[in-house]
């Protein structure tokens, strides 16, 4: 297990969890979401391959439409 900070809250995840798996676990699959890990944007094209590590600080931001 690893410990991460997700939007400011501690969360425990299985080792090897990817950004894509986290998004799916949270019920946000298919939504427009920006992901930042340790202050760096993770492009959607890398969500499936970017494994989270112990101590990572993750921010998820939902994209909102409007005008």
Region annotations inferred by a language model:
Residues 1-66:
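Ubiquitin-like/PB1-type beta-grasp interaction modules and other compact soluble beta-rich domains
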């Amino acid at each position: 297990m690893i410990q991460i900070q997700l939007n400011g809250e501690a969360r425990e995840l299985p080792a090897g969890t990817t950004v894509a798996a986290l998004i799916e676990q949270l019920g946000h699959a298919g939504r427009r979401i920006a992901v930042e890990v340790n202050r760096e944007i993770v492009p959607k094209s890398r969500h499936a391959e970017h494994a989270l590590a112990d101590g990572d600080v993750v921010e998820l931001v939902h994209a909102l439409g409007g005008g």
